[in-house]
Amino acid sequence: MRFKSAYNGILTKDDIGKEVKLAGWVLRRRDHGGVIFVDLRDRTGFVQIVFNPEISKEAHNDAQDLRSEYVISVEGKIRARSPEMINPKIPTGEIEVMVEKMELLNTSETPPFLLEDDIDTGEDIRLKYRYLDLRRPTVFNNLYKRFQITNAFRKHLSDNGFIDVETPILNKSTPEGARDFLVPSRLNAGDFYALPQSPQIFKQILMIGGFDRYYQIAKCFRDEDLRADRQPEFTQVDIETSFLNTDEFLSIMENVTANIVKDVYGIDLPTPFPRLNYYDAMEMYGSDKPDTRFELKLINVEDAVRGCDFAVFKNALDNKFIIRCLNAKGGEKLSRKDIDDFTKYVGIFGAKGLAWMRVTDKGLESNIVKFFSEENQKKILEVTKAEKGDLLFFVADTPKVTFDALGNLRLRVAEKLNLIDKDKLNFLWVVEFPLFEYDHKEKRISATHHPFTAPVPEDVAILESEPLKVRSDTYDLVLNGNEIGGGGQRIYDSKVQAIIFKLLGIDEEKAKLRFGFLLDALKYGAPPMCGMAYGIDRVVMLLQKQDSIREVIAFPKTQKGQCLMSGCPSTVDADQLEELHLSIEE
């Protein structure tokens, strides 16, 4: 038995006169004076079907009992709607199907929420009934675009000579960075597998094994606290190459990225993408993932305010802190309440306050202007290029606090002043991150990325003497202020790798225990190698203009790492625990 001969949402006036068989779910049912109209939905959209007793009394009688989300199959002829019934807002709005036969395939209970877009339903309810939520057009469209984007990655990477190779899901735990998800081994009592946080080590092994261009659509797992753009399991397009320098590799990735956006969205991206080194990104935008859809850059005002009597600035300069400013062009429209809200906001990032000055036709005005000489004020106006109607914001603190506070305030002000063009796609590379950062909690240095990242060649000489000044040969791909991918050149010299481990406090025994097979492999002619990984969930979220990656994942977890539909994680039987040589402590 054939249920359907066409998809509902793609029928047009070109199909008028054709006999068609359709199947799907009842979206809406309307009874207009004895003629019953039903919007029949499938994954492509919906079409209006008409039950007229003059065409089929039996089908009309059956349609009396139809309710929302009943599953039916119908046969009928496509005809043009009368002019007054045309709906230009939908693709099928010029046609309707006159039903000759109907088969009821299944009934449905009343859904707990409307299965339409623009619904005001809590996310918890949607996730509990995800099998219903998936029927909504926006959800399907997001997942279909994800499929298209993933397919485009496969096509363009394959066209560039990359080979799809699977790497193990069960591996040993190498506790660096986030916590591992652990899987107990039944056959090896007391031993555990770890689910991969990334295929990093295995893809380097593939390069040593002679696979010079690898990719994989890889499932990765991290046991970390969640937020809007994080999940315990996530998907990345994992990529590695050998015998390519950074410029060559980034050029390939730019072309792959541009081709994907062109194929899926029809948008031409200019290449090459702009590049900013990490230090310039922080100095200009206060962020290592800057949103460049608008200006509003940070301004160094230290020389302009030097010699002023404002204690906050004087103390900052005396303690060798930094002072930076944002010039909110047209900020005169911001109220005192807005300024107070901004002051509270920067406090989240450690700022002890937010100084401000309005620019009027009389010059600078605020309760702190009296502490600045006319010369100071003149220099502030010059260096900030401030004009009447602008509003200046200042933070004076350590570099970390100042950049974090103003970098985030920059985004908040841009939203408030409507400076962001939501239709823009601004890609850029942020390169040469610090190789190490200081962990104040652990009181030691740690790897900014991972312990296999190579330093830039010119900084190898200071690797042991000034490690915190060493730049890494790394690159992050940023889209509209969000990191969507990142990677770098890898260490392929076992001697350099040993120095890195030593600096990180990983002794020879510990290194061998965690990474022994990679360290052994590096001794057998490892080639120069580099790579990166794109976060598919985040890529799709941004291109689809969604606020959360949960909107672009078929079965997402909540911020507590739970699946509300299936009820995982869950308890297991005592017998299962015994087989795994485990017991639960109360």
Swiss-Prot record:
Residues 200-203 are annotated as: Aspartate. Keywords: Aminoacyl-tRNA synthetase, ATP-binding, Cytoplasm, Ligase, Nucleotide-binding, Protein biosynthesis. Its main location: cytoplasm. GO terms for molecular function: aspartate-tRNA ligase activity; aspartate-tRNA(Asn) ligase activity; ATP binding; nucleic acid binding. GO terms for biological process: aspartyl-tRNA aminoacylation. Its EC number is 6.1.1.23. It catalyses: tRNA(Asx) + L-aspartate + ATP = L-aspartyl-tRNA(Asx) + AMP + diphosphate. The keyword ATP-binding applies. ATP binds at R222, D223, E224, Q231, E483, G535, I536, D537, R538. It is found in: Cytoplasm. The record marks H32 as: Important for tRNA non-discrimination. InterPro entries: Aa-tRNA-synt_II, aa-tRNA-synth_II, aa-tRNA-synth_II/BPL/LPL, Asp-tRNA-ligase_1, Asp-tRNA-ligase_1_N, Asp/Asn-tRNA-synth_IIb, AspRS_core, GAD-like_sf. GO terms for cellular component: cytoplasm. It holds the Pfam family GAD. L-aspartate binds at E176, R222, H449, R490. It is an enzyme of class 6 (ligase). Coiled coil: none annotated. Homodimer. Aspartyl-tRNA synthetase with relaxed tRNA specificity since it is able to aspartylate not only its cognate tRNA(Asp) but also tRNA(Asn). Reaction proceeds in two steps: L-aspartate is first activated by ATP to form Asp-AMP and then transferred to the acceptor end of tRNA(Asp/Asn). Belongs to the class-II aminoacyl-tRNA synthetase family. Type 1 subfamily. NCBIfam families: aspS_bact (TIGR00459), PRK00476.1 (NF001750). This is Aspartate--tRNA(Asp/Asn) ligase. The gene is aspS.
